[in-house]
Amino acid sequence: MEIKIEKTLTPKAKPDESSLGFGQYFTDHMFIMDYTREKGWHDARIVPFSNLSLHPACTVFHYGAEIFEGMKAYRTAEGNIQLFRPEQNFARLNSSAERMRLPLVDEAFALEALETLIKIDADWVPHAPGTSLYIRPFLFGADPKLGVHSIDRSVFIIILSPVGSYYKEGINPVKIMIETEDVRAVKGGTGYTKCGGNYGASNRAGEKAEQAGYSQVLWLDGVERKYIEEVGAMNVMFKINGEIVTPALTGSILPGITRKSILQILRDEGANVSERLLSIDELIEALEAGTLEEGWGCGTAAVVSPIGQLYYNGKTYTINNGKIGDTTQKLYDTLTGIQWGKIEDTRGWVHPIK
């Protein structure tokens, strides 16, 4: 399929790279592609970044037919631009689409479209250390009618945003509140997808945590409220008495690409790694016994984020004296080193934009 290109006549001024924040600025262009049941995907185009015009009865507004992805483009010290495992993101996008009964995209074409878009907006990829170009592909149902029904029309869009650190703490330890009332997802639901509803449903607990001075919520399972699942924007890992434990993917947890990459790095280095059920009781016992050595979250937006404090049932627990642990620091350095081209990629994870 040909990608039609319309370049902006009024380029925007670039933001100050020292204060990018997250998701506040957007590049000059975006990719759009339409779908109808009769024609399939068509009218692939790159156009100036602008607002969308949608029918008030559009499916996405009423029935949550929406999925998205998140990835980044990095600028190396040599000035080159590269992606990190983008094929994994588009495969996960299609996994989410299948669950939500949205049309699948051609993964190779989606990557081609992304590469073309990045080349056009290449000067938006920031140069400052720790910055990157965040990539947000999203897909939604666009039928102009009410009623729960099979989706006949959809739209696929990619937008780009230069970003700094996801958390204001940066690589410094974050404080996490363990949620005991609300749940994020259950087995058989949409927990393993990146659909907007998962995040919308987390807002109440997230707001409660924020008001109490915590960066994120750590979710327990939706049935027994017993097993650790994930943080709102990250998968989680804990080092307990030398064993690195991360919750197993049971269908209610997002299969993170950063998680997958870290597990491979750890196993390649011979670390003692387990993907298993981890109860809140086991975690608290390890904290009280002093055997919980480190904890960290991991995801595309935050990369690796050390957990310095947990709040549970009215009590505050400090991990590793509130400092970043050696394993956490090494993982952060290794992963970001590969992403920014400082460390040789020996696993075929880097995808250069040529």
Where are the language model's segments positioned?
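Helix-start/capping segments and mature chain N-termini
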Residues: 1-117, 138, 145-354
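Extended, Lys/Arg-enriched charged tracts that mediate electrostatic binding to polyanionic substrates
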Residues: 126-136, 140
